[in-house]
């Protein structure tokens, strides 16, 4: 095996571990050793942490997905990024779906996504992100109140079709294992609505609420901005 092949293998494992983490609770992979995530001790390996490639990496997550404000389990509560903290239950978010390793086709069979979304994304893995502070399940998931440009991510009832289902678009993943996360309620399949970290949120120092924005490709159809590329990890901060 060549040295270049040896370097590629850990990256490939990292990509596979990332998508597995987001679609089903899993243990720490050999793809990125020495890293853990931001679930509370009560949630431990049952929870996931989504992080932005703009602000962190698999070696240092820094900021992770969380319920903002007072962390109350209420419809419309904003969802964004907080500094990773194992004692913060607002960072306890569980992956959920009709089946382990659910695909968009599985969500379609459950009546949770449209036929159009299934036609375009049916083979891709998908997930709901259920809010579970201290490992206590709520009936609220990360979603959108409406599907439009710059709509903030908020808690929505998990039984709402489309807007609470997220497609893990690994066909656009980077070699380092970061990928876009597309909302299944999108109707523009060339530039679908995806998780986005607004630059003004980072610059202002305010809570980092995530938004839905059309995918913004750079020089070619396969290059995305770091603000629309995400990683995921399972477990508890040491």
Residue ranges and their predicted role:
Residues 33, 159, 223-226:
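Intrinsically disordered, low-complexity regions enriched in Ser/Pro/Gly/Gln/His and often acidic
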Residues 79, 152-157, 213-215:
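Aromatic-rich beta-strand patches that line glycan-recognition/binding surfaces
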Residues 39-149, 167-209, 219-238:
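Extracellular glycan-recognition/adhesion modules and their associated mucin-like linkers
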Residues 147-163:
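Short helix-loop boundary/capping segments
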Residues 1-38:
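Secretory targeting and sorting signals
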